[in-house]
């Protein structure tokens, strides 16, 4: 039987939105057996640009794209949707402190959480791309009390994909050879790209890449700082790679994970690995028959434990900051 999905995308006229929508409409997230409605949300000044994007979507004549809704009203955008991809966020500007960014985005994501809570379909799932995505997700989740907490996710797949790419380059192998590359914690420069548990052609990555100095002192900082490096080189933040990672994430959350692999996504912690219950923290996950679960039996060496502590401390600080602002 043919399947149908209604998907809301916020910040739909932005760079990531532009890189995302055409691939969503062509079936790359939900499969070639699923038709799609797109509910596109933008701020009022961006609606003319969004109408141009809609014209282009129409001009692609995608067989799977059924209907499009264009709006600046979150209640309309989230009406009856099965997936809400929260891409739009206020960018960090020069001289802005992280807490200023948390406050500005906090009000956006609190409002969107409420609108999703009141208007979305009963099976809605929420995937946050807009940064700081872990804490934006936390805010949306806490403003949508009727939606189960296990339906909220934030994106660390871009970090995972970046890490896979770098390990493949260093080892001189094709990308599919690299598996089980885990990102722990926050999508920020404190994240822990865990090469210790990655595999290359079925062997531990540390056996294939013997250069421990590179792994510790080049690989980890490169992944942690990759977003900033892209901005410096391109003059704009990662857009196509972020959209690609969002599609990868949705696919992984829906489809059964291959037996020899896992994927990273930030979700609501339930005490795994000593992470506070209710924090949005990136873990290694698997999907089996549509059920997403955290892999819990991974052991960390002293280095890994320290890295987990650093990223957990940052997420606690962000939570405390938005709590003090009354956003959760």
Curated annotation (Swiss-Prot):
It comes from Coxiella burnetii (strain RSA 331 / Henzerling II). Its EC number is 1.1.1.37. Substrate binds at residues 92, 98, 131, 162. This is Malate dehydrogenase. GO terms for biological process: malate metabolic process; tricarboxylic acid cycle. Catalyzes the reversible oxidation of malate to oxaloacetate. Belongs to the LDH/MDH superfamily. MDH type 2 family. CDD domains: MDH_chloroplast-like. PANTHER family: MALATE DEHYDROGENASE (PTHR23382). Keywords: NAD, Oxidoreductase, Tricarboxylic acid cycle. It catalyses: (S)-malate + NAD(+) = oxaloacetate + NADH + H(+). NAD(+) binds at residues 11-17, 105, 112, 129-131. Coiled coil: none annotated. GO terms for molecular function: L-malate dehydrogenase (NAD+) activity. The active site is at residue 187.
């Amino acid at each position: 039987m043919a399947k149908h999905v209604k998907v809301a995308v916020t910040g739909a006229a932005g760079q990531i939105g532009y890189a995302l929508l055409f691939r969503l409409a062509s079936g790359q997230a939900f499969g070639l057996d699923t038709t799609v409605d797109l509910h596109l949300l933008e701020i009022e000044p961006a609606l003319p640009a969004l109408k141009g994007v809609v014209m282009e979507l129409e001009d692609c004549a995608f067989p799977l794209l059924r209907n499009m809704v264009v709006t600046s009203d979150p209640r309309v955008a989230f009406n009856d949707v099965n997936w809400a991809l929260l891409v739009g966020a206020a960018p960090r500007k020069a001289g802005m402190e992280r807490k200023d960014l948390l406050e500005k985005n906090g009000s956006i994501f609190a409002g969107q959480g409420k609108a999703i809570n009141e208007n979305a379909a009963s099976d809605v799932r929420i995937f946050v791309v807009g940064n700081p995505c872990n804490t934006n997700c936390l805010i949306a989740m806490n403003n949508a009390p009727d939606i189960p907490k296990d339906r909220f996710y934030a994106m660390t797949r871009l970090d995972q994909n970046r890490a896979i790419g770098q390990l493949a380059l260093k080892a001189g192998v094709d990308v599919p050879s690299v598996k089980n590359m885990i990102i722990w914690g926050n999508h920020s420069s404190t994240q822990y790209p865990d090469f210790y548990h990655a595999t290359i052609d079925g062997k531990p990555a540390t056996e294939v890449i013997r250069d421990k100095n590179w792994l510790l002192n080049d690989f980890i900082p490169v992944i942690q700082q990759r977003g900033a490096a892209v901005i410096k080189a391109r003059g704009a933040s990662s857009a196509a790679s972020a959209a690609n990672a969002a599609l990868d994430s949705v696919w992984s959350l829906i489809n059964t994970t291959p037996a020899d692999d896992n994927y990273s996504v930030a979700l609501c912690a339930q005490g795994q690995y000593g992470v506070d219950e209710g924090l949005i923290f990136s873990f290694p996950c698997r999907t089996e028959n549509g059920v997403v679960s955290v892999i819990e039996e991974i052991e960390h060496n002293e280095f890994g434990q320290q890295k987990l502590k650093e990223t957990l401390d940052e997420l606690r600080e962000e939570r405390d900051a938005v709590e003090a602002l009354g956003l959760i």
